[in-house]
């Protein structure tokens, strides 16, 4: 593993209704990036916010000497689609993702850059002493366990988006055109050298989490069905096992009927109903799982864009930080863009 040269660091942050936390987020992220001793840019992606987040991002990008790039999506597409939109607009040799809620402190960014410079393709993170409530922690643990078992990708904390990706890994992810994706797993599929570090975790200071219990459940379905066919194989094994169990149980009932007469068969009616309901439930579960896969195939075949960028606002060349100008990254002040 060889050291990886990093001249420009991009920090990509998806934003959805985070008006209250944005001023502190910008201040702390810029302060952390200034400690790097490298050129940097902060790419903030507004994912169809209903508050004033988009206005604040645009104002931040238009400041003199700002390193902020504001990417405004026309509506809400979801966290991972917003991150991919930020990837498209980023230019760094190393791209770091960070949530806007400040639960993962931006002050951890220099540690990620340090490990990535050692030659790692992907640097993940594990939330130490997680500060979320129990109803948030337990579903997250179930999601982590289910994904680890089904995908075989060994990661400890899929829900922590504070991660660093080498530029080549980002380009590989952008080349994938499937509609449903999960960035940490996708990145690990392309990475040769990966590592994880423990990072601090704080309570959410502003607003509420955008992930409800139902959204976590939907996320688990997305993870399992868009990244692996293991559930289909497991369903085949379960179906075969239940068919064998049903045959053996029917044979057992036949023997009992012959041995004890028809009266006993009448008493076993409720057992038969219970077995029938069990088999019907498994069949319906299998049909639902197949429907998930077919639905995702249909979405991929239509090949619609994963997101639509309404506008991108960057600093003018004269307003760019001197470090950015030295490496030659300049652009116009505002540019409409489509994926």
Swiss-Prot record:
Localization per Swiss-Prot or TrEMBL: Cell inner membrane
Statement: the UniProt record of this protein carries the keyword Transferase: yes
CDD domains: DPM1_like_bac (cd04187)
Protein's UniProt keywords contain Lipid biosynthesis: yes
BP terms from Gene Ontology: 4-amino-4-deoxy-alpha-L-arabinopyranosyl undecaprenyl phosphate biosynthetic process; lipid A biosynthetic process; lipopolysaccharide biosynthetic process; response to antibiotic
EC numbers: 2.4.2.53
Pathway note: Glycolipid biosynthesis; 4-amino-4-deoxy-alpha-L-arabinose undecaprenyl phosphate biosynthesis; 4-amino-4-deoxy-alpha-L-arabinose undecaprenyl phosphate from UDP-4-deoxy-4-formamido-beta-L-arabinose and undecaprenyl phosphate: step 1/2; Bacterial outer membrane biogenesis; lipopolysaccharide biosynthesis
Domain of life: Bacteria
Gene Ontology terms: cellular component: plasma membrane
GO MF assignments: phosphotransferase activity, for other substituted phosphate groups; undecaprenyl-phosphate 4-deoxy-4-formamido-L-arabinose transferase activity
Membrane-related topology note: Multi-pass membrane protein
EC class name: transferase
Alphabetized InterPro entries for the sequence: ArnC_tfrase (IPR022857), Glyco_trans_2-like (IPR001173), Glycosyltransferase_2 (IPR050256), Nucleotide-diphossugar_trans (IPR029044)
Family, similarity comment: Belongs to the glycosyltransferase 2 family.
Protein name: Undecaprenyl-phosphate 4-deoxy-4-formamido-L-arabinose transferase
Species: Pseudomonas aeruginosa (strain UCBPP-PA14)
Lineage: Bacteria, Pseudomonadati, Pseudomonadota, Gammaproteobacteria, Pseudomonadales
């Amino acid at each position: 593993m060889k050291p990886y040269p990093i001249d420009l660091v991009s920090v990509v942050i998806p934003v959805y209704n985070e008006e209250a936390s944005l001023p502190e987020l910008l201040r702390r992220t810029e302060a952390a990036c200034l400690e790097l001793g490298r050129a940097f840019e902060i790419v903030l992606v507004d994912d169809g916010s209903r508050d004033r987040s988009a206005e604040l991002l645009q104002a931040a990008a238009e400041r003199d000497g700002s390193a902020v790039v504001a990417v405004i999506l026309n509506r809400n597409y979801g966290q991972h689609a917003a991150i991919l939109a930020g990837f498209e607009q980023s230019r760094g040799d190393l791209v770091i993702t960070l949530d806007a809620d400040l639960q993962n402190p931006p002050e951890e960014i220099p540690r990620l850059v340090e490990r990535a410079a050692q030659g790692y393709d992907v640097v993940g993170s594990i939330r130490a002493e997680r500060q979320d409530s129990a109803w948030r922690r337990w579903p997250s643990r179930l999601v982590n366990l289910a994904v680890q078992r089904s995908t075989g990708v060994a990661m400890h904390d899929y829900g922590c988006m504070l991660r660093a990706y080498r530029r080549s890994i980002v380009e590989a992810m952008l080349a994938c055109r499937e509609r449903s994706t999960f960035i940490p797993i996708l990145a690990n599929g392309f990475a040769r050298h990966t590592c994880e570090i423990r990072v601090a975790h704080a309570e959410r200071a502003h607003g509420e989490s955008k992930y409800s219990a139902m959204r976590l459940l939907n996320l688990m379905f997305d993870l399992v069905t868009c990244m692996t066919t293991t559930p289909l194989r497991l369903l085949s094994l379960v179906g075969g096992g239940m068919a064998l169990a049903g045959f053996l149980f029917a044979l057992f009932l036949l023997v009992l009927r012959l041995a004890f007469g028809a009266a006993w068969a009448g008493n076993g009616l409720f057992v038969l109903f219970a077995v029938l309901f069990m088999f019907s439930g498994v069949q319906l579960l299998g049909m639902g799982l197949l429907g998930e896969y077919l639905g995702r195939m249909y979405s991929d075949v239509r090949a619609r864009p994963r997101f639509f960028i309404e506008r991108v606002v960057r600093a003018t060349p004269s307003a760019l930080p001197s470090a950015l100008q030295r490496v030659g990254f300049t652009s116009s002040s505002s540019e409409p863009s489509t994926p």
